[in-house]
């Protein structure tokens, strides 16, 4: 998985992903001029996701460098959901927000009906903050509820420290120390070799 900052050359691919069949109920859509304006904004950062096949997804972050320390994930979309890339991508976006952009809070909103995305967000440590009722106008004239979720920098740092500790413990388990009797046996072998060399 590789991430990079987007350029205007990526806009057609971004719009294609936004308009993937079945995404209309879960992913917002913007016209080219809107994407160009967002890319030009000082507080906005587009992130592209690539895998071994090519472009796999994108995200739009807003509030970069804001004095409030609030960084908003305006949009995230994966070309082929269900392969685990979304969770890994979100984890990288959260890390980027706190470590590189200096945010104090990372937040987003999601369609209340998008259970899969909300599950992924929760699995990355985001907590439920509330519901914006009938907040987003849909193409069919109805309005959708949005669920607000967030994670604080201190919460992420605590979770990251625990994750690193678990990884270290797993590494130790895969590479255990040699038992004392094996150490002794190896020492005897080394001694025999040394004797023969004399």
PLM ranges: what are they?
Residues 5-9, 15-82, 90, 95-101, ...:
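Acetyl-CoA-dependent GNAT
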Residues 1-2:
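Extreme N-terminal starter segment of soluble prokaryotic enzymes
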């Amino acid at each position: 998985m590789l991430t990079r900052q987007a350029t205007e050359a990526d806009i057609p691919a971004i719009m294609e992903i936004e308009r993937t069949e079945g995404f209309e109920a879960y992913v917002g859509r913007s016209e080219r001029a809107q994407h160009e304006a967002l890319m030009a904004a000082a507080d906005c950062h587009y992130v592209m996701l690539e895998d071994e096949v090519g472009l796999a997804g994108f995200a739009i972050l807003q509030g970069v460098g804001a004095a409030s320390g609030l960084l908003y994930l305006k949009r995230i979309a994966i070309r082929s959901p269900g392969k685990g890339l979304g969770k890994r991508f979100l984890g990288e976006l959260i890390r980027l927000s706190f470590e590189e952009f200096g945010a104090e809070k990372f937040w987003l909103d999601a369609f209340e009906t998008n259970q899969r995305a909300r599950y992924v967000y929760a699995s990355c440590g985001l907590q439920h903050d509330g519901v914006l009722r009938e907040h987003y106008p849909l193409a069919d004239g109805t309005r959708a509820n949005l669920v607000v979720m967030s994670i604080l920098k201190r919460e992420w740092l605590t979770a990251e420290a625990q994750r690193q500790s678990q990884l270290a413990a797993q590494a130790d388990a895969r590479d255990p120390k040699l038992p004392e009797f094996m150490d002794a046996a190896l020492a005897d072998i080394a001694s025999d070799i040394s004797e023969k060399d004399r």
